[in-house]
Amino acid sequence: MSLNPRDVVIVDFGRTPMGRSKGGMHRNTRAEDMSAHLISKLLERNDKVDPKEVEDVIWGCVNQTLEQGWNIARMASLMTPIPHTSAAQTVSRLCGSSMSALHTAAQAIMTGNGDVFVIGGVEHMGHVSMMHGVDPNPHLSLHAAKASGMMGLTAEMLGKMHGITREQQDLFGVRSHQLAHKATVEGKFKDEIIPMQGYDENGFLKVFDFDETIRPETTLEGLASLKPAFNPKGGTVTAGTSSQITDGASCMIVMSGQRAMDLGIQPLAVIRSMAVAGVDPAIMGYGPVPSTQKALKRAGLTMADIDFIELNEAFAAQALPVLKDLKVLDKMDEKVNLHGGAIALGHPFGCSGARISGTLLNVMKQNGGTLGVATMCVGLGQGITTVFERV
């Protein structure tokens, strides 16, 4: 396809290996260092991109405190080849933060407010826990269900509303680990994982070029033996069918179609459309349905036009209703999360949006797809979606 000058193109994508938050590979690596390493290495392998041209570094991060505080985007960019004259901002849309970072850069490019951006996100959930420093307003219970801030219970609700069984969830969990392991063994993650130094379980320093979160030994029988994690009386959501708590970062180089053509760069993809949407916080995981419907409408497409989908696996009980109502549940094995998802790889909040988008682009490249959708739910009831076309 030919590019228009203000088209938004993805030049390259990279991510860290996903590390377990409890005693994992990144336990002695700070979030800013992880981010800076990733940005530097991605720029290094794209030598046609001059770091001086970067307009803004836009970095997703949810818990912006401790080492992730004081605008981690700037903290990280100062330790990269990007000059001090380039700007940096940290954004949060909870789980969708780094996809929002992509959308912010895209909107700037579309309106002529910059040509080259570095976007991505990070979350070191081992160093900055999910609830660190959080003080929810009790008055929120006057406006939304009291359990709306408890993600596992919202997944229980959504699964129950849509008749999703425990066995369906367990099968989905096994699938995630099996596909992620298969992708690892077959080298499907090779282009997206930027190797990083870390510490193994014995405390030895080594270079990791794989995700330590994947459990290839996962079986249906093993998952069936797990107790409910959130609702002990009659619950169906377990640790084995929930996204893992992990540490990681993701990064993309994004630019205008005109600048890519000027530099002689062959992009991975162009953004066709973007959308966000809100839903009842009590069923926060349903957000990808309205946001995807909105994004497809803006692109003049239907779900039947889409070759591949990356849906963030917050919970199996959440993902399955979304796939059902997007009318792709029966096409799951052909189109959806072909390299596994967050149940196997984890969900470092600020990282995940760019991570699933980049993984989608690699799936499209490896399988010859033209159109793809990356979408995810967002805590407290939102969805965010990006439609990509491979160039």
UniProtKB/Swiss-Prot annotation:
GO molecular function: acetyl-CoA C-acyltransferase activity
Main location: cytoplasm
GO terms (BP aspect): fatty acid beta-oxidation; phenylacetate catabolic process
Keywords noted in UniProt: Acyltransferase, Cytoplasm, Fatty acid metabolism, Lipid degradation, Lipid metabolism, Transferase
GO cellular component, one term: cytoplasm
SUPFAM superfamilies named in the record: Thiolase-like
Cell compartments where the protein resides: Cytoplasm
UniProt entry tagged with the keyword Signal: no
Keyword Cytoplasm included in the entry's annotation: yes
Pathway(s) annotated for this protein in UniProt: Lipid metabolism; fatty acid beta-oxidation
Catalytic function, reaction form: an acyl-CoA + acetyl-CoA = a 3-oxoacyl-CoA + CoA
Subunit-structure text: Heterotetramer of two alpha chains (FadB) and two beta chains (FadA).
Annotated family: Belongs to the thiolase-like superfamily. Thiolase family.
Functional note: Catalyzes the final step of fatty acid oxidation in which acetyl-CoA is released and the CoA ester of a fatty acid two carbons shorter is formed.
UniProt name for this protein: 3-ketoacyl-CoA thiolase
Organism per entry: Pseudomonas putida (Arthrobacter siderocapsulatus)
